[in-house]
Amino acid sequence: MPLSANFAPRENVPNVSAITYVRKLVFMPLSESPRASTHVRSGIPEATVTRLPMYHRALVAMAARGTALVSSEELATASGVSSAKLRKDLSFLGSYGTRGVGYDANFLLYQIARALGLTQEWSVVIVGVGNLGHALAGYPGFVSRGFNVVGLFDTDPNRIGETVVVGGADVTVADIKTLPAVMQKTGASIGVIATPESAAQSVSDLLVRHGVTSILNFAPVLLDVPQGVDVRRVDLATELQILAFHEQRKAEVALGSSNVG
């Protein structure tokens, strides 16, 4: 069966693209970073970890606009959380801001990027190059955050040999049989599964067997992985069902209000 899952700066910003500027900021060597001795705390709660990317995204936009200082209220609003929750989350990074002044936007961006592991580059492989796999491979947010797609794999003869533009470069879809060699060459530790449900577990087993320790799974199935392997599951249908629940609740409330009137 084919593996393709088919689903239809401070004051002045340098004269470069926002992505280039932010990459230069967050990938600066530790010795060149401001307050480089600041220690990133371990033991950050999982709930905080899930919100750090939201703060990172908001700060990237602010950095591109040249924002030097940002208050907790401003960043919280841009991230869709309460300012109290934001301050609590940032305290785990050792960042408390200055009362009446706020946070150094650039340094806070660096702190969050470092906590998320974005101050280094990561090699990623994608298995399943249908419509969804194509879209994932072409997503510019991967490259701008340090995720380099080093391999695209499928079993469909109609997909193998196809060229996909990834981060401005052409990457050829390879036969899944070549994955072990690519893994050995690139040392990729992150795998993305964009296959049908029936193929996901075997693909997961293959990835883990050849060095992947983190998996982003788009297949609608729970994967059985050994201890030490992290899996993040993205189930689009489940997310739509949750939205349907909220839509139904809103409709019920509206109906109740009209009946009262």
Annotate each language-model stretch with its function.
Residues 2, 11-68:
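Extreme N-terminal segment that seeds HTH/winged-HTH DNA-binding domains in transcriptional regulators
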Residues 30-40, 250-261:
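Intrinsically disordered, low-complexity linkers and terminal tails enriched in Pro/Gly
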Residues 57-210, 226-228, 232-240, 245-251, ...:
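Hydrophobic, well-ordered beta-alpha structural blocks that scaffold small-molecule cofactor pockets
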